[in-house]
Amino acid sequence: MSLAEKFAVRYAGLRQAYGTFTANNETREDGKASGKNITISKELSDSDLLKLWEDHLSGHQSVGIVAIDEHNKCVWGAIDVDEYQIDLKDLAVKIAKQELPLVLCRSKSGGAHIYIFLTESVPAAMLQRKLRQIAAAIGYGQVEIFPKQTKLLLDRGDRGSTLNMPYFGGENSTRYAYDKKGAAMTPEEFLNYAKEIELTPNELEKLEASP
C-alpha cells in the first residue's frame, strides 16, 4: 500500500464528510494557529479518500477526519490537549512510562493530539468513556475527546466533528509523532508504532489508567 492508503486505513472514519483547514499564518492570543476550518458534506469513495490523504501528505490541503462512523463506531480516538506551553517531549515520555497504548502527535498549533488505535471498531460511547479515564490519568481530565459524539443523526444532517490529521506535509510536517523517548518519528515510523500499540476491543475494555 502507498503511504496515503496506509493513513486512510489507520484513520478510517465517517465517509459522509471531511474537514479542511487553511491557515492564515496568524496566531491567536492563546497560541492556537488561526485559520479557517470547514466541514464538507460529501459521500467519499475510496478514490476520494485517497486523494484527500495524498493532498494532505504532500502539504497541498490539510484534511480533517470524523472519528465516529456511520454505525456509531470508531477504530481510533484522540485526546485533544489545546495547551501550547507544554513540553510535548516530556508528555510523550510520561505516557510511555505509564505504559499507556497511546501515541502523541504535535497539533497544528503546537498542542497535543494523543491517539489510541484499535484492531476493529468499537462503539463510540465505549471509546469516549475510556479516553476520558485516560485523559484524567495523565492530568488532562477537562480537555476535548474525539469522538465528540456517541451517536450521529445522519438523516438530520449530523456529520460529527472533524479532527485535523497529523503529518500534513509528510516528512516535512510540524505535526509529527513522538516516540517513547520523545524523538520525532517519520510517517512510516508512526504507522509502525501505531500498529504495535493498537488494542483489540477486549483489551480496550480491560484497560485501566491511573495517575
Describe these PLM feature segments.
Residues R15-T20, L100-L104, Q142-V143:
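Short secondary-structure junctions
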Residues G59-Q61, L88-C105:
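Structured alpha-helical segments in the cores of large, soluble enzyme domains
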